[in-house]
Amino acid sequence: GVSEHPPWVDIDEESGRATGIEADLVTSFAEGIDAEVEWRPGPESVLATGIKDGQLDLVIGGLTTSAPWSSHMALTRPYASVPSAGGNEEKMVMGVRMGENELLVELERHLARAQGEVR
């Protein structure tokens, strides 16, 4: 699942294809595990329900550790920190379906390897 949140994720309205920092990370992760990405755009609340109900494996869209969806999905360890509007640091994460521990571990490894590319 993907929620538009530039620069982390942009969604092309015609094709439905996602681009941006997180979309690139997910695409390279999928290539590394020989998986195919199917972008399902939507608001965070709908995606949170979809992942909780088992309809999605992964949710991206500029999620942070303060996102209200931690009861719906397992959040990765933060892979980047950015300044927030209030002057604090926001820690960026992605969401994985609960119980998908192997996927979570592999994604976190990928994010750790790519961390030098993400600011």
Which sequence ranges carry the predicted segments?
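Extended ligand-binding regions for polar small-molecule ligands
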Residues: A23-I33, S84-R119
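Acidic, polar ligand-binding/catalytic clefts
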Residues: H5, R40-N101
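Extracytoplasmic small-molecule ligand-binding "clamshell" domains
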Residues: G1-G62
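Short glycine-/acidic-enriched loop or helix-start segments at secondary-structure transitions
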Residues: D10-I11, W69-S71, E106
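Short, glycine/charged-enriched secondary-structure capping and boundary segments
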Residues: E13-G16, M73-T76, R109
